[in-house]
Amino acid sequence: MDGPFGFVVIDKPAGHTSHSCVSRLRRCYGLKRVGHGGTLDPAVTGVLPIALGPATRLLPYLPGDKTYRGVIQLGSITSSDDLEGELLRQAPWPDLQPEELEVALAPFRGPIQQRPPQVSAVHVDGERAHARARRGEQMVLPPRPVTIHRLQLLHWDPNQGQLTLEVHCSAGTYIRSLARDLGEQLGCGGCLAQLRRTQALGFLESQAQALPEADATPPPPLSPLLALEHLPRRQLTDSEEADWRCGRRLSLDPGPGDAVVVCNADGSMAGIGLRQEDDQLQPKVVFDASG
């Protein structure tokens, strides 16, 4: 494989956009094909997986769930559902015990319908909602199905009206919406005060590195196989490798799932195949010696 191939996990600092991190790595690696796996708002820090070279073709096959650690401020309602937006209203928060907060959090666990924030990347009539919101347009975005797999109360500060949560959720979940809706349920309003992503697309906080300077030597990329452990694998024999690169179907043992990771005889990444009804493997993403 010519050139860098794999993933770099950046610990995105506050103040940077996801796009600015991608631009920095393009310069560091001298690559055009660089893409990130899930936008983080500028104020949010944490895990930002970035694909290098041909690995950008693997982004749709990575697990979509994410984990966040966030602080919710009760008693404040803003235009963006976080402290970055215009303060619209303030109210005193109730005197709550942790047990009462657990009761309030219970309806948000599992599959729920969630309304995205007005300042979001959701498309409205072909345009991003945040562009309309910045022009002063008021929108009521329709709720969408999301799943909150785990919602854990880590800390409650009754003096500041702040609670710290850990949230493991499906793709498309907005923690700002969770803050808004929880505050609404408690009758005082709420918004997101602070957020850090600790896991995304199969990559962990422990794998994240600081964003390198533009002229710095970039870190070696991680193997794409690290983020594809949720998929079944099919290892090629030496004689099958040429068939795979020519796009020919291969035999496949019965098993779950549609996407299958395909590895060369030496264990390196060969691509992604799709399981067919006749238990044949159809090449979908094929990597060869030239990428």
From Swiss-Prot:
NCBIfam families, sorted: TruB (TIGR00431)
Active site: D41 (nucleophile)
Gene3D superfamilies: Pseudouridine synthase
GO molecular function: RNA binding; tRNA pseudouridine(55) synthase activity
Function field: Responsible for synthesis of pseudouridine from uracil-55 in the psi GC loop of transfer RNAs.
Enzyme class: isomerase
CDD domains (UniProt xref): PseudoU_synth_EcTruB (cd02573)
Protein name: tRNA pseudouridine synthase B
Organism of provenance: Parasynechococcus marenigrum (strain WH8102)
Keyword Isomerase: yes
